[in-house]
């Protein structure tokens, strides 16, 4: 399967892609040595066969025992889910190699509720303080495919009362939250 995957990546590269994201929530599971070795080998093969910059995205939980594996994969950036597991930030900051970018999943892509901006900004600023702004990306915890598209389209008061609606954020609003966090934290990306 890997050679076919690399063919697809090369086609993207030929079309002008510079970055790709590989979602790997599997890294949040309990893995044995054989599974860890397979992941390392797969990413090594991809790295050897493409010049694309790669971000590996983990989500739905923390990296736990797979943190060392994840930070040492041959990729340019690592994405972690801080909405689900904010306590992993300190340990990741302490072991992240100096050449890696860290993407912080601070806006929850799994629910319809507004973000705690203060908490998210605190996490972003902690990472920026340790890594520098040029090595910190601000992102959703995972894809926003789990939430409805746009709260502005919910116009019927009887279906969604204003008192509840004001606490909600759908995908469009979550993108606005990301922009606000980026601006308020002064993040480069």
Task: Give the positions of each predicted feature.
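Domain-level signal for soluble alpha/beta catalytic cores
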Residues: 1-189
